[in-house]
Amino acid sequence: MGATRVVLAGGRGHGHWHLDNLRRLSARGLVRLAGVCDVTPLEPAALTRLGRPAQGPDLGALIDATGATAAIVCTPIHTHTALALTAAAHGADILLEKPPAPSLGEFRRLTRGLAGRGRACQIGFQSLGSHALRAVRELVADGAVGEVHGIGAAGNWVREEHYFRRAAWSGRRRLDGTDVVDGVLTNPLAHAVATALHLAGSTAEEDVEEVRTELYRAHEIESDDTSCVDIRTARGTRIVVAATLCAARAAEPYVVVHGSRGRITFWYKQDRVLLQRAGHGPDERAYGRTDLLENLLAHRADGTPLLVPPAATGAFMRVVEAVRTAEDPQPVPPSRWRTAAGERSHRRVVDGIDELVDAAAEKLATFAELGAPWAAPLRPAARR
C-alpha cells in the first residue's frame, strides 16, 4: 500500500504541529502531503521536507485536484463542522481537531453527516491515544485504590495577552452571531475534561447526567480564562475539572482518580502515572502513546478501531454545551489579579489561582465551594 495522500486545512498556529507530524510520517513512507488549504499560502520554509503540495482556499476543490483520501482539519472552532463535512463529501477520511464542534447541535449535525457519507473521522484528543489510560483503568478495575470516590483534573497554564489577539475568534464565545466557545475548558485545556471523562468510563452523550459551570475571566475577553466544571455522570461519579490561563507558573496538567485506599495521578501530556496507596511506596511509570493520525491510517488500511471516533466525545460535547449555554463569564475584580511581564506581551495572574486549581482537583470542590473571594455559586445545572 502506497503513501496516503493528505490535505491539511489550517497550516498555521497549531497546524505547525501537524506539519511536523506529517514530516515524521512522510519520512516513514506512510503519508504524502498533497495539499494545504489556507486563506493565505504557506511559505516554502514551512513546508521543508514535505515537497511542493498544492495550496488553495477551497478544501473540496483541493481534495478533488490532489486525489487526497485523508484530510486534517485544524481550523477555527466554528468552522470544524462545515469543513469536516466538506472533506467527507469529497471522499476523504478526517482527523478533526478538538473541540469537534462549538455546540451540541453542530456536533450532532457532524455525526449525522459523517454517517451519511460513510467516512471515518478521528477527533484530535491526542491524550486519548496514551497507553497510560488502559493502565489506569486496569488499576481501578483491580481495586488498587479501592472504591473510586471521584475524579479531579487540574490545569495551570500561562497565556499572554497577545494569545487572545491571535485571531478574530480568539477568546470569543460568539463571532458574528455564530458560536465559537473558545474557553479554557473547551479549547486549550479541553484534554483535561476529555481525559477525566474517559477515565470515568463516560464518553457518550448519555453518559453525562448533569454539568454545572463556574466561568470567570481576568482578561478583557468574551470567553472564560479561569473556570471549573462539576460533572455528574450517569454512573454517579463526580468529576471536577479546574483550569486557568492566568497561573503564576505554568504546570503540567493532570487528572487524579481518588479512591478509598489511594489515588492515581495521570499527567496526560507526559503519559506519566503515579500510584499512591496505603501500605505501599509510590509507584511511578511512563507509557507510550499511539499517534491519532497513525491510528486513522491503520483504520483505513485494515479496520483497526479508531481511538477517538466522534461518538467517544459526546460526553465532552455535553460539557461544551453547558459552557455555551451558561451566562457569560464573570470578570475577576481587578483587585484580585495583577499584571506580569511576559515573553511577548503582558499577562494577568489571578491571586492564588495555582493553589486553588490544585485544591479543586484534590478536594473535588469548585472555586466557590473552596471560598475563592471572587467566585460565585455554581451556575444553573445543564441536565440531560
Which residues does each predicted region cover?
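N-terminal Rossmann-like dinucleotide-binding module
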Residues: 1-50
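Glycine- and charged-residue-rich phosphate/anionic-cofactor binding loop of Rossmann-like
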Residues: 31-33, 302-313
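Conserved acidic residues
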Residues: 34, 53, 69
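Short, conserved SAM-binding/catalytic segment
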Residues: 45-52, 109-114
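Short acidic-hydrophobic, aromatic-tinged amphipathic segments that line or gate anion-handling sites
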Residues: 54-58
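Beta-strand-loop-alpha-helix segment that lines the small-molecule cofactor/substrate pocket
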Residues: 70, 76-77, 81-128
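Predominantly a Rossmann-like dinucleotide-binding segment in NAD(P)-dependent oxidoreductases
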Residues: 119, 128-211, 219
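Contiguous beta-strand/loop segments that form the cofactor/metal-binding neighborhood of enzyme cores
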Residues: 187-272, 279-306, 320-324, 337-384
